[in-house]
Amino acid sequence: MNDPLSRRDAVKILGLAGASMMAPGDLPARIVASATSDSMPADILPLTSTSEVFTPPRGRSYNTFSFDFPEPSVEFDGFRFGFLVFTGENAYALDPALMRAVTTSDSMHLMCNGFTWAGGQEKSPGILTAIFKKAGNSITWDATVDMPHPVKSVTTIIRGFPRGRVGFGGPGGGTPNDNEILTGYPFSGGDLFGGNTADGMGTPLAIVTATDNSCVSISSLDTMVCTKRFFFQPGEQGYRVEAIAEAPGWNQQKQWLSPSWRILRTATADAAVQAHYEHLDRTYHLQKWDVRTDVPAWMRQVALVTTMHGQHFTGFIFNDYAKQLKILRWMATQMPAERVLIFLAAWDGRYYWDYPNYKVSDRMGGEVGFRKLIDEGHKLGFRMMPMYGTNSANRKQPMFKQVQDAVVNKVDGDVVDLNWVDWDNDRHQEGWAAYMNLGVDSWRNWMVGRIDEMITRYGVDAYFLDIVGGHINSRNGDMHEGTRRLVMDLRAKHPNVPCVGEMAYDALVEFIPMFHVGLGRLGQYSKNFQHLSSPAPGRGSSGVHESGFGRFNPETLSLSPGAIPTLQVVDDTFSKHRDVMAAIIQKAKERAGI
């Protein structure tokens, strides 16, 4: 159902053309042109937001209307479909008096020439057309909307999903219950805080496993990264499902072709996952780890990652440059240094506060100390990787005015602050950091310049992008495309210096070969090591990370079975827990067959 022109290109074209791209008279042609002699009119079903769901809710619930919001629907292949359209001003339902639909044995074409608002009490101009196609065990559809105001999002409402275990990105576990479920892609759909926030998923796929273990899945077939959400609302016989697609915030289009969705009936969850990943492989040109061309030979040989914690937000120094070098000299006596990647966390001064200057810290040893660390580390054989904040900038830094136009504005215009950490422990979250968008030239160029200088000046082997998976649909630029451009621009200058990231979603693994969080099924494309907040030997310090102390497990050495072994080095690790360091190194050698 996707045109040869990519969705990203189409979005650009439509954004330039505006609502004049398609006159109202053109929209019915989508139906007329594809109607056939066996077409039959479909009944319009007078459903509402409370139809066939528990009212009031019986378990965990989210914000919902407190009245019957119209959801006129049509039936196709055992499911009932309706639509809601959202602009920055209001929520709109299809006007049942202006709806018509025709069906064939393998298609349904829906047309609506007007909307209602105020729960059906008022009317609004607008047009929606949707085309559904059935092929074997799948249903696919898309919708085109034309509204008086820029479209924020379009929701397809589906009834007919069975009750069962609900999973996202893969099969769900546990016992089904009466909770409502809201999950967003990527980065929880951009809403992180408050009582109505979504869980996160790395790819837009939801699977319901029924009591007989058969599965019904729904997935987005989009060819670009933009926010998606699934909302599952239970009733006695099944789920009312919302499949929500946000329009690209940076274009503010009144007329929008929403991305395609697919419902798939399969005998197993694995079959649903396989079908979805075949779409991802085609769309994002994903390559399995073993055949990736952006992985240097040394990265394939990494058997241990060592996180060297530098300077905390408060200025407390865990390990200065001289101490880090002393530790490296000892480590080189324990295993081949060329098999170790050194992750330099907070190498540049006060963690987050000094973002985004990215200059060596005088308090940690200055230019001389840092250069000695890198040069001697290289001579020993280690690979060195400094850390950068993909989307964090302190408004109080003098340079901030150069990049202030890149602060993220969500699709509804809400300014995003990076304000979810209490760095100074006054029991109040900080408010000085802005959340930045690599889709804006000023910020991307700044970051490329800082990373390029580090590679050129010191010859570091890789660079780490913190929160790179924190995608938000922003009004001031395409964040995913900006991230891709940053990586590709640096790759053009330094082809053997790879990017490593925190937090993954499906399209990111196309150009980032390593992460420091678990990847699940995305691990077939990229590898991962353990997060820098993982508890260090001894008291379980999280180092520069805000979480404080965890529990280090001396039996497992706190090593994750699916990750590259990772050694966390904080202030007392080398002085008090060198024996545990040696044990972790030995375990890494055993796993690698060294």
Spans of features found by a protein language model:
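Beta-sheet entry/capping signal
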Residues: 338-342, 381-385, 461-463, 496-498, ...
